[in-house]
Amino acid sequence: TFTKELKIDQSVAHNGVCLTVVAIDGDVYQVTAIAETLAKTHLGSLQAGDIVNLERGMLLNTRLDGHIVQGHIDQTATCTAIKEEGGSKRFSFTYDPSTGNVVIEKGSVTVNGVSLTVVDATRDGFSVAVIPYTLAHTNLHRLAVGSVVNLEFDVIGKYVARLVQQR
């Protein structure tokens, strides 16, 4: 099971939110989310039985399949449209652009901890196409219009944007 290899003090991403394991008892482990985490993410709205994406920290000696994801959620977004596209689905999201976060077409974004490629982008939104395999192995297939998701923007893009702002 997932918990067999866990150790106290390790990080586990829960829908993209990095949380530290503080206790383990058999197949159950415990994490702590502080007020800041609950305010910036959708974790506070989860109910018992909700399915979340779980991912352990990456080892630095393995291949990077996706983009660099830290588990530091920047903000939430709302799903505004879902369109079937030959077995895949295109999800559209809007977010508050006043935070200064940006996405670019063919760039990377993390939605609920899933590394995805941006199909198109606007000032306050973007869309991603999700293949059947990813839909089957994540909780993205459960999204509906109006669902709130956690976003982590590309860390390299965030640093570049900050450097440009400071000039």
Question: Over which residues does each language-model region extend?
Answer:
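Conserved loop->alpha-helix
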Residues: 1-167
